[in-house]
């Protein structure tokens, strides 16, 4: 056994005294009173903030939502299966934030930006708060640039501008997600970063969307935030805010972003579940009193920034699902009142083969017309009126047997315009193609073409224009206008193609 000399003992004691750290670590600790259904009631944690992150003994994270007199109601982000009554909880002193950066492009992540695509960790240097204040009045400017969706019916009749919030609303299986995905596909080469937020969707549906985006090369400029149907309610509630936070990072760098929230009905249901479990008083349709604020604070973050802030933009396309075309339910009316217009999709039109199934009569864009390109404005000015008149006459014509010639002409024109606006999914059209087909329809070139041949005429005309008259496309795409020269080329092309088309049909 080694012996220690007395002088060594004094040296050891001196070293121990020198190494002694007087700093005290103060942590705010509480105790779990009750846990279950993704909710925990905690005693203690006197100095906790609203929406502060909490750390449970088993490593689960929670968010403090209810700060009551004698306890705290927290929601669990995770299963929380190992949390027991009496477990300790620490407050972290942090509000929920996520890592953001260019590294997210092309990735599929959960609402906390953890990768779900098996492509390894995401290296981000910056982080942003999930709940950020929306830009103020001085920080914004009015919407003036178009966001081309590639869907002729929308770009001609319900145009969307960069920085706008346009609601896509309709029953299940009416093509809401298809409209949003088509819009993302059409942003290729437009320098727009797209974020698709899937809330409460089936995993197979999310995989299908990711598959289409990957196949078409759209994942190069897209990010998918997924909180599937099997995700805990708090993650489904946070997912849209996470998508907005990622978009804000790019927006404040002067870039243009597009965010699709698919869909906000499921986010409201997740929030209702959490609120009822936290014993918050229920209101209409059992939703809590602040469900309007839930969506307004999210959608107000979409903006077109002023020139001082770099002129970036965030365009929001929220999706809301209705039951039996009831637009007057609680969540649909809330979101309609917050957004700058809505695209209403109808199951009757969808089943009748009119796809995209847009009801032109009640769909509206409140600010998009200011952003519509001059070329589109020139050719599409009369199409909305003509379609609306056609719908009225169509209902009338079912009961009247003998119609005057003018009415018959109007009905024939309306049928052809309706046929012209049909478009298969995942095949967006460029601006010059849209202008060409609408010009052909509104200027009467299709009036003597049989309705069933309008679709093949449209396809043939676009192919003919691209091969024999490429200058037309160059002029329209570079100037965004239908100049006199472009119009002459277009007239010549339509006349030439129509002659050959009619000759072949005969």
From Swiss-Prot:
Protein name: ATP synthase subunit alpha
PROSITE patterns in the record: ATPASE_ALPHA_BETA (PS00152)
E.C. no: 7.1.2.2
Gene designation: atpA
Membrane topology: Peripheral membrane protein
GO molecular function: ADP binding; ATP binding; proton-transporting ATP synthase activity, rotational mechanism
Signal peptide: none
Residues under site feature: Required for activity: 363
GO CC annotations, alphabetized: plasma membrane-derived thylakoid membrane; proton-transporting ATP synthase complex
Localization per record: Cellular thylakoid membrane
Biological function: Produces ATP from ADP in the presence of a proton gradient across the membrane. The alpha chain is a regulatory subunit.
Pfam families to which the protein is assigned, alphabetical: ATP-synt_ab, ATP-synt_ab_C, ATP-synt_ab_N
Chemical reaction(s) catalysed: ATP + H2O + 4 H(+)(in) = ADP + phosphate + 5 H(+)(out)
Protein family (similarity comment): Belongs to the ATPase alpha/beta chains family.
């Amino acid at each position: 056994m080694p012996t220690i000399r007395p002088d060594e003992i004094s040296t050891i004691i001196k070293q121990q005294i020198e190494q002694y750290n007087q700093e005290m670590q103060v942590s705010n600790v509480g105790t779990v009173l009750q846990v279950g259904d993704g909710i925990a009631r905690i005693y203690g944690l006197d100095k906790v903030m609203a929406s502060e992150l909490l750390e449970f003994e088993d490593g689960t994270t929670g968010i403090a939502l209810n700060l009551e007199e004698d306890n705290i109601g927290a929601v669990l982000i995770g299963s929380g299966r190992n949390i027991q009554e009496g477990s300790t909880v620490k407050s972290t002193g942090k509000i929920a934030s996520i890592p953001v950066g260019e590294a997210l492009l092309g990735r599929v992540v959960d609402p906390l930006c953890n990768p779900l695509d098996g492509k390894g960790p995401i290296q981000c240097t910056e982080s942003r708060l999930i709940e950020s204040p929306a830009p103020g009045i001085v920080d914004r400017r009015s919407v003036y640039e178009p966001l081309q969706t590639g869907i002729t019916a929308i770009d001609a009749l319900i145009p969307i501008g960069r920085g706008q919030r346009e609601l896509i609303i309709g029953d299940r299986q009416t093509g809401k997600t298809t409209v949003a995905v088509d819009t993302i596909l059409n942003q290729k080469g437009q320098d727009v970063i797209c974020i698709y937020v899937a809330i409460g969707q089936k995993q197979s549906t999310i995989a299908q969307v990711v598959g289409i985006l990957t196949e078409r090369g759209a994942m190069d400029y897209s990010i998918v935030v997924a909180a599937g149907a099997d995700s805990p309610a708090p993650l489904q509630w946070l997912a849209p805010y996470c998508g907005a936070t990622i978009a804000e990072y790019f927006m404040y760098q002067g870039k243009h972003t597009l965010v699709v929230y698919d869909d906000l009905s499921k986010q409201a249901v997740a929030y209702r579940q959490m609120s009822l479990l936290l014993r918050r008083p229920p209101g209409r349709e059992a939703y809590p009193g602040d469900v309007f604020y839930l969506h307004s604070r999210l959608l107000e973050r979409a903006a077109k920034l002023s020139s001082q802030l770099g002129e970036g933009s965030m365009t929001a396309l929220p999706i809301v699902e209705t039951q039996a075309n009831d637009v007057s339910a609680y969540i649909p009316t809330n979101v309609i009142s917050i957004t700058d217009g809505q695209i209403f999709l109808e199951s009757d039109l969808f089943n009748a083969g009119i796809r995209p199934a847009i009801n032109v009569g009640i769909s509206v864009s409140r600010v998009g017309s200011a952003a519509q390109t001059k070329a589109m404005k020139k050719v599409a000015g009369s199409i909305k009126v003509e379609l609306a008149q056609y719908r009225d006459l169509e209902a009338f014509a079912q009961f009247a047997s003998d119609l005057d010639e003018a009415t018959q002409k109007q009905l024939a024109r309306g049928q052809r315009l309706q046929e012209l606006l049909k478009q298969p999914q995942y095949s967006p059209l460029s601006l010059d193609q849209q202008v060409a087909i609408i010009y052909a329809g509104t200027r009467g070139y299709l009036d003597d073409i049989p309705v069933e041949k309008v679709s093949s005429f449209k396809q043939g005309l676009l192919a003919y224009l691209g091969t024999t008259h490429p200058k037309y496309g160059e002029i329209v795409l570079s100037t965004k206008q239908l100049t006199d020269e472009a119009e002459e080329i277009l007239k010549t092309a339509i006349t030439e193609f129509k002659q050959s088309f009619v000759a072949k049909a005969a």
